[in-house]
C-alpha cells in the first residue's frame, strides 16, 4: 500500500508540473513575445516569382498592447537584404486612413515590396519603399484589418496614445531598431493620424522617464492627405472646373454651386466663432459638395460600369453610385490572398480574423468630435521636423488644389505660406518629368503627375524617390530638381497592377527571407519543441499506466479502501486531477471615401470618402465626452472598399 501511495504521489507531481495541457496553455500565452514568433518565411509564390536576393526579410503578427482589453495591433515589417548605407538605420511606419482602413492596402498595392497577381501569388514591386529603409505597415486603430480589441477609439488623441504604446512594444521586440531614424508615412485620413502621432512622439521626448531613450523622428510623408477639412472641402468645385469635369453650362451647375455656397458659409462662420475649424474633422454639409458633383455628372447613357467619375482618379470611370469604390483593380486579388488560411498562418496570426479592407465599426466609433483637425498641429511640428506633402494630380477627394490653398493660409516659421520668391522646381526622376516641387522652412509640397489618390500604386518607382526628396537626396540646377532613377538591366514600367506583370525570377527556397542566424534559431527552437513533446507523450503514457494500475487494484480488493465513520457513510474523496478546475475567463461623404465601409453598388448613398463616419452612423459614443472609448459590438470586421469610404456616403482612402 505504501509503495502504491508513493507512486501515486509521483504521478500527481508529474501531472501538476508536466501537464501537457498546462504546458500548451503556457506556450500559447507566451506566443508573440519573442522576435522569432513573428518571422515570415513562406508565402504563395515567394520562391516561385522572386529571386532569392530580392526576397525581403519579413516579420508579421499581432502585437499585444493591452492584455486587460485584449488589444493587439497587427504589423508587417519588410527589410531589404541589400540595404544601401543611407537606408541602414531608418524605419518607415506606414498607415492607411479610413478611419478603419487596413494598411495592407499600402503593403500589397502601394509602398510594399509585394504585389498580388491574378493567381493570388506574390510578385515583386520594383518601386518598393523598403529599399529606402525598413517599412512597417500597421493596422490601426484596433478593429482595423487584422488588429483587434474589445474597445474602439473615438478621438484622435486616443490614436496618438495607443500608437505610442505600439511603438514601445515594437521596440521591445526589435531593440536593434530603437535608435533608428523614424519616418511616419501614409495617405488620406492618415493626414489626421500622422500629425497627432508625431505630436505625441515629440512630447514624449521632452519628458522621458528614467531609462527611456528618445525616438528619433526625422520626418513625415503624407500622400493626398485629409489634413484641413475647410480648405479641402472648398476645393472640390474649383478642381472640377479646372479639370474640365464641370462648367457653368452644365444642367447640374446650379445644384453644385448651391451646395458649395452652403459649405462656404459654414467655413466663413467657423473663422468667426472657431466652431467648425477647431472642432470638426468632417462636416456633413461640406461632404455633400463632392456628392453633388458626382451625382450631377452621372452619364446614364454610358454602360453600367462607366456611368460615374472615379473620385480617386478622374480619368477613370466606375459604376454609379460606387464612383471609385471598385478601384483599384488589385483589391480583389488582395482580398482573396489575405483571407487564405495559408497566408494567415504564415503571417503568424494568433487570432485569425477574416480580413476586410475597411471596418464599418471603427468608422462609426471614430467620430473625432472633440479633436481639432491635424492642420492645427502643423506650425509646432514644422519647428522640429521635416514634413513632405505629396499629391497625385488626378485625385478629386484629396486634391492638390486644396493642399496648396491650405499652405497659403498656414502660418509657420515666422510667416504665412511659401515666400513669394520661393521657386517652383520641375521634378525629374531619371529622364521622366514626374511633377513639381516647392520647399521652404521644413515644408515640402510635391505635385505628382499622372497619379491618383494612391500615388505609389500608379507610380511605384517615382513614389519611392519621395523619400529621397524628404531627406534632401537630390540635385538642383536651372530650376530643375533631379532624383536618381533605380539602375536596372531591364526596362521597368511603373505599372499600377501586379496582375499585369509576370516576374520570371529564379526559384529560391521558401525560407530565403531569413538570415542564417534566424534560421538556426528557428531550427533550435523546433528541436527543443520536439523534445518537449516527447517528454509530454512519455508523461501521458506513465499517467495512463498508473491510473490503470490503481483502478485494477481497486477492482481486485474485496472491501473498500476507504474507512467509514460510525454513521456508515463513506468520506467524499476525489482524485486531485478529477476535482473541478476553475475555468479561465475566455481569454458624409468623406466618411464613405475615407472609410469605404460597405461596397454598395446599386443604391445611391452620400459619398463617404474614407475620411470619417457617415450620416447614418450611431452617435451614441460621443455623448459621454472625449474620454469615452467605443465598445466592440461584433467579433467580425467588415470590409468597406479599397479607398476607405463608408458605404453610407461615398468617397476615399488607402
UniProtKB/Swiss-Prot annotation:
Disulfide bonds listed in the record: none
Membrane topology: Single-pass type I membrane protein
Protein's organism: Clavispora lusitaniae (strain ATCC 42720)
PANTHER family recorded: PHEROMONE-PROCESSING CARBOXYPEPTIDASE KEX1, SERINE PROTEASE FAMILY S10 SERINE CARBOXYPEPTIDASE
Function as written in the Swiss-Prot or TrEMBL entry: Protease with a carboxypeptidase B-like function involved in the C-terminal processing of the lysine and arginine residues from protein precursors. Promotes cell fusion and is involved in the programmed cell death.
Subcellular location: Golgi apparatus, trans-Golgi network membrane
Main location: Golgi
Regions crossing the membrane: 534-554
Glycan-linked positions: 69, 89, 442, 503
Record field: compositional bias (Low complexity): 508-523
The protein's name: Pheromone-processing carboxypeptidase KEX1
Amino acid at each position: 500500500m505504501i509503495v502504491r501511495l508513493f507512486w501515486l504521489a509521483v504521478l500527481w507531481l508529474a501531472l501538476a508540473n508536466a501537464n501537457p495541457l498546462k504546458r500548451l496553455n503556457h506556450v500559447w500565452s507566451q506566443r508573440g513575445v519573442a522576435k522569432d514568433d513573428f518571422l515570415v518565411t513562406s508565402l504563395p509564390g515567394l520562391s516561385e516569382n522572386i529571386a532569392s536576393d530580392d526576397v525581403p526579410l519579413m516579420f508579421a503578427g499581432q502585437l499585444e498592447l493591452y492584455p486587460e482589453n485584449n488589444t493587439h495591433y497587427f504589423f508587417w515589417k519588410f527589410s531589404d537584404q541589400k540595404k544601401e548605407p543611407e537606408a541602414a538605420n531608418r524605419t518607415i511606419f506606414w498607415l492607411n486612413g479610413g478611419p478603419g482602413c487596413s494598411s495592407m492596402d499600402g503593403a500589397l498595392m502601394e509602398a510594399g515590396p509585394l504585389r498580388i497577381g491574378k493567381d493570388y501569388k506574390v510578385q515583386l514591386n520594383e518601386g518598393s519603399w523598403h529599399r529606402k529603409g525598413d517599412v512597417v505597415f500597421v493596422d490601426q486603430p484596433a478593429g482595423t484589418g487584422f488588429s483587434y480589441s474589445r474597445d474602439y477609439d473615438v478621438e484622435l488623441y486616443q490614436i496618438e496614445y495607443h500608437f505610442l504604446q505600439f511603438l514601445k512594444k515594437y521596440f521591445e521586440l526589435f531593440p536593434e531598431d530603437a535608435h533608428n531614424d523614424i519616418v511616419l508615412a501614409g495617405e488620406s485620413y492618415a493626414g489626421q493620424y500622422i500629425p497627432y502621432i508625431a505630436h505625441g512622439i515629440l512630447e514624449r521626448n521632452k519628458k522621458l522617464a528614467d531609462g527611456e531613450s528618445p525616438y528619433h523622428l526625422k520626418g513625415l510623408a503624407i500622400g493626398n492627405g485629409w489634413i484641413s477639412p475647410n480648405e479641402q472641402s472648398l476645393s472640390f468645385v474649383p478642381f472640377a472646373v479646372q479639370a474640365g469635369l464641370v462648367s457653368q453650362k452644365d444642367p447640374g451647375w446650379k445644384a453644385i454651386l448651391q451646395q458649395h455656397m452652403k459649405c462656404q458659409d459654414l467655413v466663413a462662420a467657423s473663422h468667426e466663432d472657431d466652431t467648425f475649424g477647431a472642432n470638426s474633422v468632417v462636416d456633413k454639409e461640406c461632404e455633400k459638395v463632392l456628392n453633388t458633383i458626382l451625382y450631377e455628372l452621372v452619364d446614364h447613357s454610358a454602360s453600367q460600369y462607366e456611368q460615374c467619375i472615379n473620385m480617386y482618379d478622374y480619368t477613370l470611370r466606375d459604376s454609379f453610385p460606387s464612383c471609385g469604390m471598385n478601384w483599384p483593380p488589385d483589391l480583389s486579388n488582395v482580398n482573396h490572398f489575405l483571407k487564405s488560411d495559408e497566408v494567415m498562418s504564415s503571417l503568424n496570426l494568433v487570432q485569425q480574423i477574416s480580413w476586410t479592407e475597411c471596418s464599418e465599426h471603427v468608422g462609426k466609433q471614430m467620430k473625432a468630435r472633440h479633436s481639432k483637425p491635424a492642420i492645427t498641429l502643423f506650425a509646432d511640428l514644422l519647428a522640429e521636423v521635416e514634413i513632405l506633402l505629396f499629391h497625385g494630380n488626378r485625385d478629386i477627394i484629396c486634391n492638390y488644389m486644396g493642399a496648396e490653398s491650405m499652405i497659403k493660409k498656414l502660418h509657420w516659421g515666422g510667416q504665412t505660406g511659401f515666400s513669394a520668391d520661393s521657386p517652383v522646381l520641375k521634378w525629374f526622376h531619371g529622364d521622366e518629368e514626374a511633377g513639381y516641387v516647392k520647399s521652404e522652412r521644413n515644408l515640402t509640397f510635391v505635385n505628382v503627375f499622372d497619379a491618383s489618390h494612391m500615388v505609389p500604386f500608379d507610380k511605384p518607382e517615382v513614389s519611392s524617390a519621395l523619400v529621397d526628396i524628404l531627406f534632401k537626396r537630390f540635385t538642383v540646377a536651372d530650376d530643375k530638381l533631379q532624383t536618381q532613377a533605380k539602375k536596372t538591366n531591364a526596362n521597368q514600367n511603373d505599372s499600377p497592377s501586379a496582375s499585369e506583370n509576370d516576374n520570371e525570377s529564379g526559384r529560391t527556397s521558401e525560407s530565403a527571407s531569413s538570415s542564417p542566424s534566424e534560421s538556426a534559431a528557428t531550427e533550435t527552437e523546433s528541436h527543443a519543441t520536439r523534445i518537449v513533446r516527447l517528454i509530454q507523450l512519455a508523461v501521458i503514457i506513465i499517467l495512463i499506466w498508473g491510473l490503470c494500475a490503481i483502478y485494477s487494484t481497486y477492482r481486485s480488493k474485496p472491501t473498500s479502501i476507504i474507512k467509514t465513520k460510525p454513521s456508515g457513510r463513506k468520506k467524499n474523496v476525489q482524485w486531485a486531477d478529477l476535482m473541478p478546475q476553475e475555468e479561465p475567463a475566455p481569454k458624409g461623404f468623406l466618411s464613405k471615401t475615407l472609410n469605404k465601409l460597405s461596397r454598395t453598388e446599386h443604391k445611391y448613398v452620400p459619398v463617404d470618402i474614407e475620411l470619417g463616419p457617415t450620416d447614418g452612423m450611431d452617435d451614441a459614443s460621443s455623448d459621454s465626452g472625449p474620454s469615452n472609448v467605443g465598445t466592440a459590438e461584433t467579433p467580425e470586421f467588415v470590409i468597406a472598399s479599397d479607398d476607405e469610404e463608408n458605404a453610407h456616403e461615398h468617397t476615399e482612402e488607402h
